[in-house]
Amino acid sequence: MSSRKSKNNSLIHTECLSQVQRILRERFCHQSPHSNLFGVQVQYKHLSELLKRTALHGESNSVLIIGPRGSGKTMLINHALKELMEIEEVSENVLQVHLNGLLQINDKIALKEITRQLNLENVVGDKVFGSFAENLSFLLEALKKGDRTSSCPVVFILDEFDLFAHHKNQTLLYNLFDISQSAQTPVAVIGLTCRLDILELLEKRVKSRFSHRQIHLMNSFGFPQYVKIFKEQLSLPAEFPDKVFAEKWNENVQYLSEDRSVQEVLQKHFNISKNLRSLHMLLMLALNRVTASHPFMTAVDLIEASQLCSMDSKANIVHGLSVLEICLIIAMKHLNDIYEEEPFNFQMVYNEFQKFVQRKAHSVYNFEKPVVMKAFEHLQQLELIKPMERTSGNSQREYQLMKLLLDNTQIMNALQKYPNCPTDVRQWATSSLSWL
């Protein structure tokens, strides 16, 4: 009887954990509109009112949301649109068009995407239009039910807005802003960009039709607020089916937020970047360690997740190099120390390596020059070194100037973790100014 009971408990636990994983992953990955906004309530109110004026009163508007990557621009617009669509008279009437500068790389593709999202492919058919403006006006005209007050408002969201400014003649931007200034179909044009100088990219005729409304997001919260965000992002909602499990989970999250080692991890991430995406990545990696046998997150999970986040990819490449390639990197390190970061060539590295070989007076590291050259070229392929300028067909490879893309700290840290690194190689790396 007891074994059956424990089996049932285990199944309940597994089911709870799968729900926890689903809820939190959705929160971390998709920044769903169900998550909370942090420190942008004023901006949210401004944007929400602007959208309501378009949807409810037929007032056309344009606005730019400006902020660094990960500051919450997409999350802000998603929240505002979700709230707007919850209004009964709006949900059936307002149309949304989402464009992205990375996908719609010219105005022709953008216009096709607008037609598709407005479900007007059948209306357009095989019609031939004289200009882009005529085509766009026809699309919006097709949405009208009668006069201006009964027209379908359209919300245009332009992600990576600065990339649209590079389109030929900025035709799309000109026509969208022109419609937002005229008494045609009510539209709201919302641009999302991380460039502060975005207005400098706009042509004079485009700029004159833009309302010059700007909403800035700057991640201005402090560390206490960052810890609060950490708690809110990990906590389970009140409507979670298993109340007992949710209470235990949330108590554990509260305990973690007060743990000194966890606070050190969070402080480190906060100092590097206030970007919530980096926090989500940390939490996602820690969440991956939660299983039926390990149902609650621990400080160790977060510490190990932090180490994965801050892992140096170039140092990891060094761990997989041959001893000869390691020796060449150490030779480059010494050349950088001697010549104060001046570029070097293969011949200089080879000479430095030969000094080491002759000093050790044994044949373990005594490779033929073509073999050393092959190892040098492999380092270039791995992008641990790079040429200072393009090579011409006439130039000799061994005299091409190179630059090392690893600093001394990275090299020494990688050597400490290098499996079975020979003692004399490690000593050579730590010696000052080579063997001079």
From Swiss-Prot:
One example of a Gene Ontology biological process annotation: polar body extrusion after meiotic divisions
InterPro entries, A to Z: AAA+_ATPase, AAA_16, ORC4, ORC4_C, P-loop_NTPase
N6-methyllysine sites (modified residues): 7
Subcellular location: Nucleus
Primary site of residence: nucleus
One Pfam assignment: AAA_16
Gene Ontology MF term list: ATP binding; ATP hydrolysis activity; DNA replication origin binding; nucleotide binding
UniProt key word Protein biosynthesis: no
Disulfide bond annotation, renumbered to this chain: none
The family this protein is said to belong to: Belongs to the ORC4 family.
Subunit structure: Component of ORC, a complex composed of at least 6 subunits: ORC1, ORC2, ORC3, ORC4, ORC5 and ORC6. ORC is regulated in a cell-cycle dependent manner. It is sequentially assembled at the exit from anaphase of mitosis and disassembled as cells enter S phase. Interacts with DBF4. Interacts with POLQ.
Protein name: Origin recognition complex subunit 4
Organism expressing this protein natively: Pongo abelii (Sumatran orangutan)
